Structures are given as C-alpha cells and as structure tokens.
C-alpha cells in the first residue's frame, strides 16, 4: 500500500513538472516574458522609439572573432549558456568532497535581453547576458571558462528602437539607419556601434518577438 501511494505521488509530481515545462515552453513560443531585465526609466517615447536611462547592471560577456553577426552569435550564446547553467564556481556555497569542502557550481537564472554589438577590433563581436540584480562583481559565480568576463555596466542613456520579426544582417542595417535618423531628428548625439537586444528564444513566433537596436547617447 505504501509503495502504491509513493508511486502515485511520484507520478502526480512528475505530471506537475512536465505540465509546468509545457506551459513555460508555450509561453516562450507566443512571446510571454517573465524574465528579469536591467532596470531603466523611459525619458521619452515616440511610437517604437524611446530614450532610456539605465541604472548600472552586471553582465557576463564574451568576445568572438568573425565576419558577421550571424556567423558568431551561436558560438557566443553557447559559451554564455554554459556559464549560467553551471560551468562556474559559486562564491557563496561549497560541497563536502572526500572530507574537505570544495567550491560548488551554481545555476544562474536566465535574464533578458541577450545583447550583442561590435568589439573594438576589426571583425570582433561582443555578446552579453545581464545577470540577476541580486549579484555584484564580488558575489556573482566565477566563470570556469576564461573567455567569459564579468563586468559592471555603468549608468548610461540609450536611444532604442523596438521591433518584431527577424534580426538578419540586412534587417539590422535598416533598423540602425531608422534609429540614427530619429536620434538626429531629436537633436541627440550618439556614439559607438549599434547594440542589438533579443528578448525571446529562437523558437518564438517571429511576429511576436521583442527585438531592439540601441545606441548610446553621448555624455
């Protein structure tokens, strides 16, 4: 009888877990988001254009070499995903191994968006995941992969264009031109290269995706 009760409890628990995974997957397909994002205040909005004031936030970033956006984005995502899914050393916990305490790894909650922009060198690209706000440089799990760098982004003002659909190279060039023209019309001086921001996983229906291109406002 006890075994039968345990089996029933296990089956019900497994069903709940599978149902929750199904609901979360379905939400991501239709563009429903529940991920933490860097904190900001909107200073101005005109249609799909915004001026935002970002507070400082922490990122895990990786630099890659390649000729274009599409070529390197997959590699960068895998490296950063490996870090947040446990290829790291926790600074707050340890496990007991063979009679001595050793540092444990720690899973990190996924956040949004995934950022990408050009690096300072030719054919260099940077991809970044923002980390949950509960962490800072001293407390965030330390990357095992030396390609992953933790960095605090200082407060910054950005002009932003939000759009749905795909983010191919040609799409981004057109959106960048739109954003630069809007900033010029507003009398806003911008600096640096375009930054892309993806808020949804690749399997989200394209017309429901939340994408952005961003440019930093000159100090």
Can you say where each PLM-predicted feature lies in the sequence?
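A solvent-exposed interaction/effector surface
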Residues: 2, 6-14, 18-219
């Amino acid at each position: 009888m006890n075994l039968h009760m345990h089996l029933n409890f296990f089956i019900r628990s497994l069903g709940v877990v599978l149902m929750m995974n199904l609901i979360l997957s379905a939400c991501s397909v239709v563009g429903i988001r529940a991920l933490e994002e860097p904190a900001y205040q909107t200073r101005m909005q005109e249609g799909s254009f915004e001026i935002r004031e970002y507070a400082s936030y922490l990122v895990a970033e990786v630099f890659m070499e390649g000729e274009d956006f599409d070529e390197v984005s997959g590699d960068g995502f895998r490296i950063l995903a490996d870090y947040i899914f446990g290829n790291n050393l926790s600074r707050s916990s340890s496990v007991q191994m063979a009679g001595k305490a050793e540092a444990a790894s720690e899973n990190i909650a996924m956040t949004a968006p995934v950022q990408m922009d050009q690096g300072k060198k030719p054919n260099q690209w940077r991809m970044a995941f923002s980390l949950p706000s509960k962490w800072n440089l001293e407390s965030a799990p330390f990357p095992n992969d030396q390609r992953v760098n933790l960095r605090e982004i200082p407060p910054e003002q950005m002009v932003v264009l939000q759009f749905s659909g795909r983010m191919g190279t040609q799409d981004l060039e057109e959106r960048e031109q739109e954003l630069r023209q809007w900033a010029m019309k507003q009398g806003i001086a911008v600096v640096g290269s375009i930054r892309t921001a993806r808020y949804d996983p690749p399997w989200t229906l394209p017309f429901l995706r939340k994408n952005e291109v961003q440019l930093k406002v000159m100090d």
